[in-house]
Amino acid sequence: MIFRYWGATTDEINSSVVGDDLCADATLIATRSITISALPQDVFPWIRQMGFGRAGWYSYDWLDNLGRKSATRVHEEWQSVNSGDKVPSGPISFTAAIVDAPRHFVLEIKSFGKQSPKLHFTLAYELREDPQGTRLVTRMRSHIKLPFGSLFERFILGPGDGIMLRRQLLTINKHASPFSKGER
């Protein structure tokens, strides 16, 4: 699958990430990582403010933000997302399952039955201290219990998420770096 382990080390791929237990029966798992020349507390606000109608997703705005440009600075008014809050993603919303600033931010979607969901998706952002600043490790996990769910994961969700998340990580790196033109 394209970009399934983009930027991730073998240790990052094989280690656990906060939120792995939320979608423990995942049939698709992807780990993507990037090193950012900024401290975790300077990177985390960029992640916390994400969402449709908020800062956007820092990816291909024409696709995941209906053409509205993603934020190029940190907005204080979008820094109040806490565990249990909704994070809009267009017609549906994620739940901020885990928010532990400035280390962890985990988004989750569960639908079609809370006990045994037909669709379960998590996206974890783990900010690890690094000699160069921050190592941002992401982990996407999904399980789709619908007809052709595994085909959808393999040929659409996996590659699509890989392309979009790669762009997101590069954009966060660009904005959060102290040498970027993004404003703090």
What are these regions (language model features)?
Residues 23-25, 84-87, 115-117:
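Short Gly/Pro-enriched turn/cap motifs at secondary-structure boundaries
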Residues 38, 42-45, 91, 122, ...:
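Short, well-structured alpha-helical interface segments that form or flank functional binding sites
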Residues 29-31, 90-92, 118-124:
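Short, surface-exposed coil-to-beta transition loops
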Residues 37-41, 97-103, 126-135, 174-181:
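A short, structured loop/turn motif at beta-sheet edges
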Residues 1-77, 175-184:
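Hydrophobic ligand-binding cavity/cleft-lining segments
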Residues 75-92:
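Glycine-centered loop/turn motifs
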Residues 13, 112-167, 172-174, 183:
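Beta-strand/loop substructures that line and gate deep hydrophobic ligand-binding cavities in soluble
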Residues 77-80, 99-108:
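Short, hydrophobic/aromatic-rich segments at coil-to-beta transitions
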